[in-house]
Amino acid sequence: MIRNVAIVLTLAASPSYAEKLTLVAFGDSLTQGYGLPQADGFVPQLQSWLTANGAEVTVLNAGVSGDTTAGGLARFDWTLTPDVDAILLNLGGNDLLRGIDPASSRANLDAMLTKAQALNIPVLLVGLRAPGNYGPGFKADFDAMYPDLAAKFNIPVTDNYFFPLIDQATRLLSTDLMQPDGLHPNPKGVIVAVNALGPQVLDLLAKVKK
């Protein structure tokens, strides 16, 4: 009897193992894995990285090639199912390519973050930077969008998804890490991007309250 009581007390005092979490990677072709074999895409590589680093998580691919922030907002509610614990939000690249007014992109991202916040779902916002050829006003507005939203919603943000893929000698995206289109990373580039983002994703998952 004493032995049984001791076992019960020991189990009660032991730390409980966390449930497996669900992380939604929500974005465009960078998330979806455009131009890559499935296993080499961003989501499978992130899943492998997180598992190797001890995270009990399933990463779901909610990337749609060509999606804008408006498109993302239109499908965001479908993604917010009860099993979603955290979101990695990477949208805005196609808005940039199309020259969409940053004010519109900001409003769409704001609406998505508002929805996530209402459900207490932690979000990591993946930032981007506009090139100078859009003009100084456009660039300033676009570049400020991500840090401003992160500050408003008190969420973490990455400065620039592509920063780890830049050749520091040329200050341009490394051709060794990019597909021939110059817009999407190749398998090697995906690994570099995942290695850069991974620690922040671990921090995001640590904020989940089950």
Question: Where are the predicted features?
Answer:
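Bacterial N-terminal signal peptides that target proteins for export
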Residues: 1-5
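Active-site phosphate/pyrophosphate-handling residues
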Residues: 6, 41, 188
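N-terminal signal peptide c-region/cleavage motif recognized by signal peptidases
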Residues: 13-15
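Serine-esterase "nucleophile elbow" of acetyl-processing enzymes
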Residues: 17-65, 75-83
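N-terminal helical cap/lid subdomain that shapes the substrate entry/recognition surface
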Residues: 66-70
